[in-house]
C-alpha cells in the first residue's frame, strides 16, 4: 500500500517544521515516516528537520520551489511528485510522508492529487482575529492547529475568542490548540493521525 501523504501548510514561522519534528519524535517506532519540505530558494527547513528530528537524513528531501511556494503544492506539483517517488523508492515500507509547504498566506491549499490529508497551522502571535478571516487553508484543511498559545498574554490575544471563531468556521471539522515547545496539545494532533488518518489498530482506546 502506498504511504499516506499529509500536507502541512501555514505562514512563515507558524511552526510547520516543528510540528513535523514533534510528530515524528512521538510516533517513532510506531510507524515509518518521511518528510518533504518546500522552500523558495534554500533547503533550510530540510536541514533543520534533519538536525532536530528523529528522521534519518535520507528520509528527508528538500524541494527548492522558486517563486511562489503555493504553485508547488497546488498548480504544478511535479517537483513534489518527483520527491515523493524518490523517497518511496528509498523506503518502500513507509506509512506516512509529510509534505511541508513553504511559508504561505491564509489562502494556500494543497492539491488533492498531491496529498491525502492536510493540516493548516497558524500561531497566536499573528493575532486573535486570524481565525475569523477564515482563509481557504484554514477552512479546507482536515486539521487546523493554533500554535504558540503561550504567547497569548504577550500579544493581547484572547484564546477563547480564537477557539470560538475556529468552531464557527470549522463546524464539525477538528482543530487543536498547541504550544509545541512543551508538547501541550500535541496529543490532539497524534489522536487525529491515529484515528482519522491511519484508522488502524493504532487508534487509542
Curated annotation (Swiss-Prot):
Major localization listed first in the record, in broad terms: cytoplasm
Signal sequence residues: none
GO BP, sorted A to Z: urea catabolic process
Entry's localization field: Cytoplasm
Chain positions recorded as GTP binding sites: 10-17
GO molecular function, a single term: GTP binding
Gene Ontology cellular-component terms listed: cytoplasm
Chaperone found in the keyword field: yes
Pfam families hit by this protein: cobW (PF02492)
Keyword terms of this UniProt record: Chaperone, Cytoplasm, GTP-binding, Nickel insertion, Nucleotide-binding
SUPFAM superfamilies membership: P-loop containing nucleoside triphosphate hydrolases
Its job: Facilitates the functional incorporation of the urease nickel metallocenter. This process requires GTP hydrolysis, probably effectuated by UreG.
Subunit relationships: Homodimer. UreD, UreF and UreG form a complex that acts as a GTP-hydrolysis-dependent molecular chaperone, activating the urease apoprotein by helping to assemble the nickel containing metallocenter of UreC. The UreE protein probably delivers the nickel.
Family matches, as NCBIfam families: ureG
Assigned protein family: Belongs to the SIMIBI class G3E GTPase family. UreG subfamily.
PANTHER family (alphabetical): UREASE ACCESSORY PROTEIN G (PTHR31715:SF0)
Protein name: Urease accessory protein UreG
Lineage, highest ranks first: Bacteria, Bacillati, Actinomycetota, Actinomycetes, Mycobacteriales
Amino acid at each position: 500500500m502506498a504511504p499516506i501523504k499529509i500536507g502541512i501548510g501555514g505562514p512563515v514561522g507558524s511552526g510547520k517544521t516543528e510540528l513535523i519534528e514533534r510528530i515524528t519524535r512521538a510516533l517513532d517506532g510506531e510507524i515509518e515516516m518521511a518528510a518533504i519540505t518546500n522552500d523558495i530558494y534554500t533547503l533550510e527547513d530540510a536541514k533543520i528537520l534533519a538536525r532536530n528530528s528523529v528522521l534519518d537524513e535520507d528520509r528527508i528531501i528538500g524541494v527548492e520551489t522558486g517563486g511562489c511556494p503555493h504553485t508547488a503544492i497546488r498548480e504544478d506539483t511535479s517537483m513534489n511528485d518527483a520527491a515523493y517517488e524518490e523517497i518511496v523508492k528509498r523506503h518502500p515500507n513507509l506509512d506516512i510522508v509529510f509534505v511541508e509547504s513553504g511559508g504561505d498566506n491564509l489562502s494556500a491549499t494543497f492539491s488533492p492529487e498531491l496529498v491525502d490529508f492536510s493540516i493548516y497551522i497558524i500561531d497566536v502571535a499573528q493575532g486573535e482575529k486570524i481565525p475569523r478571516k477564515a482563509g481557504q487553508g484554514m477552512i479546507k484543511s482536515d486539521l487546523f492547529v493554533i500554535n504558540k498559545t503561550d504567547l497569548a498574554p504577550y500579544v493581547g490575544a484572547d484564546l477563547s475568542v480564537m477557539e470560538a471563531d475556529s468552531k464557527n468556521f470549522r463546524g464539525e471539522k477538528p482543530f487543536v490548540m498547541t504550544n509545541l515547545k512543551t508538547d501541550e496539545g500535541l496529543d490532539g494532533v497524534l489522536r487525529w493521525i491515529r484515528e482519522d488518518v491511519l484508522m488502524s489498530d493504532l487508534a487509542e482506546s
